[in-house]
Amino acid sequence: MIDIIDYNFNNHIKNDNSKFNNILKKYQINNNTFENGAILDLNDIGSNILYKNEDKEKDEEEYYYYKENQNIYNKIGNDLNYNFQYNEYIENNDFENNQPIDNFNVEGSGGGKQIISYYLSKNGNDTTGNGTINSPYLSICKIVNIINSYNGINIFKVFIEIGNYEAVEGCTLNIINNSVVSLIYFTKNEIINNNNNNNFNNNNNNNNNNNNNKNNYNNNKSNLIIPNIINLNINLKNSTFFLNYINLHYFNEKVINITYGINTFQFLIENSNLHCVNPKLPYCNILFNKLNQSLIINDDNEAMILIKNSNIIKFDFYFNIIEMNVENSNLYFTSLYSLISQNLTFSKSYFNNTLIYLVEYQAINVSIDHCKMIYDFSNNIQVFLMGTGNILTISNSQMESTGEFFSSYITCKNAKVQLMNVQFINWYLLRPFINLSLNSTLIMENVFARKMYIPAFIEIGNSELIIDTLEISGNKLVLIIIEGPSVISISYLTLKYQSEQGSPIMMNFPGGGFGMKTIINITSSNFINIDGFTLKDAQLTLFNVSMHSDSINSLFALSSSQLFSSKSTFSSSLIVGSYFLFSLDFTSLVDLDRCILTNSSSLFQANSFSNITITNSLIDSVFSRSVAIEIQGGSSFTMINSIINKTYVVSQSFIYSSSNSDIIIHKCNFLQFVMGLKPLGNFLNSNVFIDHLLLYQSFFQNQIFVATSSIMYISDTKLFNNSIYGSEMFLLNNQSYLLMNNSLIYGNSISVCFSSSHSLANIHNVTFQNNSGIFLYSVDSKISLSLLEFSKNPISSLYYLFYFTNSSATFQQLTIDSNYFMGSVIEAHFSEILFTNLIFSLNQNVDNLLKDRESPSLVFTHSNVKIINSTINSNSQWSLDLIWSQKSILIIKNSLFNSNSIPYNGYLIRLETCHLSLDHCLIFGTQSIEGTIGSFNSIINATNNLFLQNNALEMGGCFFLSNSQILSFSNNSFLNNTASIGAAIFTNGTLINNTLIIKSNKFLNNNAYEYGDNIGSYPTWISVEYPEDFDSTINYIRLYDNYSNLVADNFYTANIIIYDSRVNENISLTTFIRGGSGDFNYSFNVFSIYDFQISINIIADGFNINYLKYKSPPKCLNFQTSTLSDGCIFCPINQAATPEKGECTKCDTNKLVCLNNDVHTLQDYFMINNDVSKVYQCPFGLCSGQNNCNSNLFLLSSLQSPLCSRCLNDYNNENDDENQFKYNNNENSGSSGNSNNNENSNSNSDSNSNSNSNSNSNSNSNSNSNSNSNSNSNSNSNENNYNGGDDDDDEKNINNYKPSKSKNGLYCCNKFQPLLLIPFIFWILFFGLFLSLFKNVITGTMIGQIILFLQLNSIVFYPLPNIYGLQLFRMSIDYFDRYCLFKLDYIEKISISLISIFLIYLIGISDVTSRLILSILKRSLKLKKLIPLVIEKQLRKFEYYKMNRINTRLKSNWNIYLMLIQPLFHCLISLIVPKSIGSTTYLSIDLTILFISTPIQIVFFFSSIVILFLLEFRWWDLIFVFKTILFTSLSVTLLYNPPVYFSALVICQIVYSYSQFAFSPQRKDHMYRVENLLNLFQLSILIVINTSIIRNLSFNLIGILFTIVIFSCSLITIIYKLFFYKKLKTIKNHRLLNLIINVDDNKKKTNKNK
């Protein structure tokens, strides 16, 4: 029932909050009044409240409160009853004249309409009365009969006084023909005005002025205060029926029908009642346009029903009207059947068991405002049944029920419902409360539902639902059941389940078909104790939503659905079960933004390619015994800018993913995790992307992240103050891949940070600080680490920081700084390790006393290790070595070792059976006991390094080499290093070439406390110094190490045994070696007929040194001879002794200078093996005198490089020749030496028990002798340089070397440039194409003669250096001085030249150039103007040459042959001319090639001359061929005698030039003059080069000068011919085009000539 007090007493209560007003709001008029048989008295408001209070609640306090304020209640009743507009009608009526004025404007009522008024009163009389106000009628039927008797259009006004008027049976009021009937209440004794509306007062004696207005209707029911018309039948057709303050009652089993016609009518009820009590039929019916239950719709209908301030009781309305308005009325047990009504409006009314039925497919609008609707029956009746086109609007109303419904309260099919400010209370339904289907729309605003005992609140299918502010409570209630794809919008919903959970939204169909989805939007809502959402093919959007569930089911179970949530909160207190807060399947999606997940267990589960995204959210207080987040089946999980706090996972992982799923975590904080038996993240066959993650203050019993066959990308991550007990932080298994960069690992207590097995890891820019434990453990993996920083880690690991086995690792910019280690820093076994830009500084490594373990910092076994561009600085290694390598390859390049300390027994670098390559490194300030680099049974390559201020208390300040081998050791600098022995290098069982080491490295200010400032070893050999004269008997013993250092570290005893052939017995002596020296007294000064055997043995701790020498009379120095009287003496001036005979031989003063001990060669001469009988002249300027070459590129060795024929570059990067290279550089280019200064123990190596020491000293005998020659004069040398100097030894040594591959002509290459091959190839092609075009006339042209001129000079000046480009004319690839294309010997280069000549010949004899030019011109005739005249002439003759092919072919072949004969002869003759030096014969052109036999090419050459020459050619060609052979032969044979060579060339050139000038073999005059001019130039060049002016010039300047001169002569010749001899005729008409077009004519002419 409507709250009347709320709607009518606003003026009294809107500003009053007193208890009285609260009581008024609490007690409302309800249907109990009518259930007890009473009829409502609108005036008796106060009594009604008292009745309700006394009957139900018996509240004494409220009862007495009512009594005290009874006057106020009465005033309220008056306000209610007079709140009508009845006064408007009374004012406009003339009651005295019985002619009230009609105030109704009825269509058609004007003009001739008759207005008839009648009065009806209980004091009237039907017989005597006339119906006026003074004589009214008594019964209603009297009035009915009168009205029915009228015809036409009339206006009837019936004024009825208070009373009960019952119609007899058959009394029916007929209102037809557009008539108007008004039933109006009136009272005769009351003065009515606008200021007093008290026409209807309650039955209270407190107001005596209104007693006459009451009339008693005594049927023991109630009192009626307005007229009551009982059981009146009404027939309304095309007319108007109006009730004002009139009650219509139908009861006492009376069958009553109020029927209306088809067309226009008005049915107005105002301040009246329609009441049906106990009729015969279940309901009283008012039928509007009901004809056989069919609908008749008239477009002209303008019918209207107005019900205002009235009561409708137990009626059924069937109406087809335009508008129905019910205002401030009460409808009891009434059914409204709207057929085609457009607007139904109910306002401020009360509905009791009232039903509204609307017809489908009609635009019917139902509006209910400020109403109250109560239902108490239990049946299958639907209150609101909405069809297509219907619209229902309920606002500011209350719906309440006490019964139990079997159907929905509101049912919509393709209709629209609006609920605004509505309350639903105490509903019991077996079906959903509201049912929407077939594109219906439901809009709910400010709806409150309490005590709802229904299966579902809303059932929706294929419709739209909008909820704004809904508060609902109930148990096990489904808020929305979705039966088909729909659109749902919910805001400000409060759903709270008390004891049993219910589902907010449930889908009761398989899902959307044909791509249709259910759209759900929920904002600003609260769900408490719910069961969960189960969605399929739906899209759910949440904003500012709070949800809590204690259900064992998932809060969200999604299948092929999407969930978008923002600013929402989700929680579940359940900690057991296998259900997740969010469960996704079949490509579902969850997107959470700014959400909170709290007090939950399992959070997310995704399967079948589903996606979860969390952004800006908080996950707090998670406690789970199972997996919290499970991602499988190709699904993805993304978390961005979120926080996970206080998470406890007992027995499973927090995140588990598998089956090609993706995990993305971006800008998230994981705080205070506690993980049990499983890792935080367990990834199987997944892709993991983590960046900007903060993991803080968490505890793990197992790993943090485990990747198995997965890919992990981690960046910008911070791991702070976490504890991992006994396991790894990151574990990679089974082909996994990890990329981690820009991260910080700080303050963590871990066992292993990264563990990788059969996987790949790339760790970049990671800082590892203040942690404990192993950083990386790798097995069968490939690791790349860059920009890593490890600093300030106290006791990082008790074992190692990095561990690799069977792995590959790359370190780039690794920083290990200020750490304290009790184990190895990096260990690698059977692995490959690369360090680039390593910084290892300020670290300390001590013995691990807890584990009884000594550990080097860097440990490498069976591995390949490279350290490049690195710094190892200021470290303290208290446990063994800083770097320890075993059976590995260690490469260190461009690195710095600075101020490292090894206080105990250890090395900076220790090598055991390793290969070390050290290049461009600085090792500075190493403080150690044993040394800087200790090498044991290893191989050393060290180049371009600096060892500075390294200090070792024992042996080897920089290197300690034990049984090791040096492959290369050059360009190293050892400065200010100190050690007890060998301040730079110490060797034990290792023998290095001291001379080579000293020469190719720099040693400065190194200081050994005992001996070996530069290089030292243990004592290895003994030297005995015998007296130089025959009178002295004191012999000195020197004890040396391998490098001729006096062993001055101890006292040694030497046992001497001398066998003297003079007495034929052994003589024993003993002496002491102090400071490396000792002596014994014995005379060996005898003549050569006697000999001695000296044996010396020194035994000391750890070694045994023996010396055995068969001594003969002393040998003389180089160039000395021996006599019995004078001994060794120098020969007279201009004489010197030869090594072979030992006799004085006269020196050739043109070649040598012989002045006692000063014996040296002059310019352009070279001496072999200090033998004055073996002095040879060098090619032009090749030897500079003093037995030296003119360039430092040559090898100075009289045997290996005779006459400066070999280059140093022949041995660069050639391992086969390394020993030969060392041998060559040990030889001294000086001319004298000392033969008696030292004797060493080389000959006694077999008798020494220490085989290593003896073999080493034997193999380095040359260097030992050489190192002791410092005390002699500059002329001293050692006798072992030539080892006897006989020819057999020379030949043996010479036969061991290979041809030189680093020469450009006679000179050494400075650089190698393969790109020079490209211009050479272009030249060969160009020259071949040129000969192809001019092959028929080339020898008779100026260009041909110039080419021959350049070819000849390229051969003549072959010995000169700095010739550029000229060599191309003899087809040589050495056309750029001091540059070589490749490393090739002379035979290989000649082969290339011969192949090039052959290719030029093949191209030249073809017609390829002519055909190519003609082909181009045929395609573009415009190009013919660009063709030079000389080429055009050859093209014009092309057809003639083709027709005379036999004759021209032979001539052209001969011309090409003449153009190539000079380079061809030079190549062939250079291969057959020998040069003998000593007993060895070399190829004259290259002394590094041994001469074998005459090449077979020369046979083919002479055969070709015979075959190609025919009588028809001129005899002058034979002279040219002869001249070519002569010049070429002289250039090779006289190569080593330049003066004779150039003189012979001058004579030959004079004869040839004169013959050509005198006999004039050239038929063409202009060519005759050109040839004479070229001959003149050639003769002048040959004469000038042999002058003293040229020979006194700089050697390198001569070649450049003559290159310029030769090409200048060629240019002058061309200028002479073109401008000074004869002007070329201008050919105006180009006949080339005619030649191409008229080819057929030319062929005809040729045939005619034949």
Swiss-Prot record:
The chain crosses the membrane at residues 1314-1334, 1347-1369, 1390-1410, 1454-1474, 1489-1509, 1515-1535, 1539-1559, 1570-1590, 1595-1615. GO terms for cellular component: membrane. Residues 197-216, 1218-1296 are annotated as: Disordered. It comes from the Eukaryota. It is found in: Membrane. Keywords: Coiled coil, Membrane, Transmembrane, Transmembrane helix. It is a multi-pass membrane protein. Residues 1224-1284 have a biased composition (Low complexity). Residues 194-225 form a coiled coil. The keyword Cell cycle does not apply. This is Transmembrane domain-containing protein DDB_G0287209.
